[in-house]
Amino acid sequence: KSCCPTTTARNIYNTCRFGGGSRPVCAKLSGCKIISGTKCDSGWNH
């Protein structure tokens, strides 16, 4: 699961993934983070 701090970061992540980027690369690019659980931390719910 990916967690992003802002809607803009989420959009960047989604665009990157749609373009064929891997999850770790897109998370780093957008400022999002990949977690192993199912619930994002407070403030990372985008």
UniProtKB/Swiss-Prot annotation:
The modification Blocked carboxyl end (His) is found at residue 46. Signal peptide: none annotated. One of its GO terms (molecular function) is toxin activity. One of its GO terms (cellular component) is extracellular region. Disulfide bonds join 3-40, 4-32, 16-26. GO terms for biological process: defense response. Its main location: secreted. Keywords: Disulfide bond, Plant defense, Secreted, Toxin. It is found in: Secreted. Thionins are small plant proteins which are toxic to animal cells. They seem to exert their toxic effect at the level of the cell membrane. Their precise function is not known. Belongs to the plant thionin (TC 1.C.44) family. This is Phoratoxin.
